[in-house]
Amino acid sequence: MAFLALGINHKTASVDVRERVAFTPEQLVDALQQLCRLTASREAAILSTCNRSELYIEQDHIAADAVLQWLADYHQLSLDELRASAYIHEEHDAVRHMMRVASGLDSLVLGEPQILGQMKSAYAVAREAGTVGPLLGRLFQATFSAAKQVRTDTAIGENPVSVAFAAVSLAKQIFSDLGRSQALLIGAGETITLVARHLHEQGVRRIVVANRTLERASILAEQFGAHAVLLADIPQELANSDIVISSTASQLPILGKGAVESALKQRRHKPIFMVDIAVPRDIEPQVGELDDVYLYTVDDLHEVVAENLKSRQGAAQAAEELVSAGADDFMVRLRELAAVDVLKAYRQQSERLRDEELQKALRLLGNGGNPEDVLMQLARGLTNKLLHAPSVQLKKLSAEGRLDALAMAQELFALHEGSTDKTPQ
C-alpha cells in the first residue's frame, strides 16, 4: 500500500494554469474511473476548487510519473508545462498534506473552513464513482478528524476570514460607504453565499443574485433580502451595479468586454468594482482593460488576505503540530493494519490444523481409545503441526546466516536467552 497526493494550487500555478487543470463536477466520476484504470491506482479521489486541483491516490507501488502523465493528457497539457507547477507528496508526506489542506493550513486564506466541506464533497464523489476503498477511506476519515480537532483546539477559525471576506474588504477600500452601493452577485454557491452575508452585514443598499436557475438564486436571495434573477438578466442589472462578484462553475466566461462597455455607457462611466473568484474565470480578462473597471481575480486578493490574517498566525503553529501528530498516528495505525491480514491467515491455518487433530482424536475416542492417551496424542500432534513450518523456515534462515531474521523470530515468539526449560526425557 502506498499513498500519493499530487496537484497544483494557488502557490505553484497561475490562475491561467489552474483553470486549465480544473475539473467540472460533471467530469469527476468519469475522470476518477479513468484515472484508476489507466494508472494502476487501486483507490483515488479528486479535489478541484478555484485554488487547487489535487489527486489523492492509493497504489501498490508509487507511480507518480504515470499519474502526472494522465493528468496532463486529460487536460491536454504538455507534461513539462504541468510538471513546472505540480507538487508530489508520497506516503507520510501525502497523509500530512491532506490533513493540512482539510484544516485550511494550505489555503490562500489561512484557516478558511470551506475547504473541509470541499474535501468531504471530493470523498462523496469518489464513493459514488466506486474509487474509494478501505485504505483511502480510512485516510479521509482520519483527515476529517484532524481538521475537526484543529478547529476545536486552536484559534485558527477565529476572526472569520475567507476569499469572500477579502473581496468585500477590497470593495470597502474602493467604496468608503457600502451603504450607498448596489451589488450584483453571480452564482449561488457557498462562496457567493458568504459574499452575500458579508455585504448584507456591511449594509449594502441593494443586492441582486443572478444564477442559472432562478430557484437556487431565490433561496439565497431570501436569506439576505436580495433580488433573484437569471443569468440572462445580467446585462440589465449590470448598469445598476457598483460591485460585481462572480463565482460559478461555468466553463465559459459569463461576462464579456462588450457587455461591460455597454453598461459603463449607461452608467456614464461611473466605476464598477469586479471580483472574479471563479476558476475557470467568469469574467473575460479583457474587461480589466476598460478605464472605469477595477477587475480583480483570486490571485489579486493575496494582499487583502494577508492583512486580515495576522490574528491567525499564532494559532497556525499549534495547528501544524496537531496535524503532524495526526499524520504520525495514522501511519502507525496503518502499519498495524498491515499485520491484520497476516494474523488472520495464521489464525485460519492454526484453526484448520486444530480441527484436523480434533477430528482424529474424536475418531480414536469413538473407537474406544484411552482418553488420556488420545489427549496426549492430540496435544503432541497439534504442537508438531503448529511448529513444523516455523521450524523449517528457522533452519533455513540459520543455514543462510540470517541472524537478523533469527533475532526477529526470537522477539516474535517472545523467547529470551536462558528461558527455555529442559524437558525430562
Curated annotation (Swiss-Prot):
Enzyme class name: oxidoreductase
Matches recorded under InterPro entries: 4pyrrol_synth_GluRdtase, 4pyrrol_synth_GluRdtase_dimer, 4pyrrol_synth_GluRdtase_N, GluRdtase_CS, GluRdtase_dimer_dom_sf, GluRdtase_N_sf, NAD(P)-bd_dom_sf, Shikm_DH/Glu-tRNA_Rdtase
Feature type site, description Important for activity: H97
Keyword NADP: yes
Metabolic or biological pathway: Porphyrin-containing compound metabolism; protoporphyrin-IX biosynthesis; 5-aminolevulinate from L-glutamyl-tRNA(Glu): step 1/2
Binding-site residues, NADP(+): G187, A188, G189, E190, T191, I192
Residues holding substrate: T49, C50, N51, R52, S107, E112, P113, Q114, Q118
EC number, as in UniProt: 1.2.1.70
UniProtKB keywords: NADP, Oxidoreductase, Porphyrin biosynthesis
Record's comment describing the protein's domains: Possesses an unusual extended V-shaped dimeric structure with each monomer consisting of three distinct domains arranged along a curved 'spinal' alpha-helix. The N-terminal catalytic domain specifically recognizes the glutamate moiety of the substrate. The second domain is the NADPH-binding domain, and the third C-terminal domain is responsible for dimerization.
Subunit structure of this chain's protein: Homodimer.
Function: Catalyzes the NADPH-dependent reduction of glutamyl-tRNA(Glu) to glutamate 1-semialdehyde (GSA).
NCBIfam families: hemA (TIGR01035)
Miscellaneous comment: During catalysis, the active site Cys acts as a nucleophile attacking the alpha-carbonyl group of tRNA-bound glutamate with the formation of a thioester intermediate between enzyme and glutamate, and the concomitant release of tRNA(Glu). The thioester intermediate is finally reduced by direct hydride transfer from NADPH, to form the product GSA.
Family under the similarity heading: Belongs to the glutamyl-tRNA reductase family.
Protein name: Glutamyl-tRNA reductase
Organism: Pseudomonas entomophila (strain L48)
Gene that encodes the chain: hemA
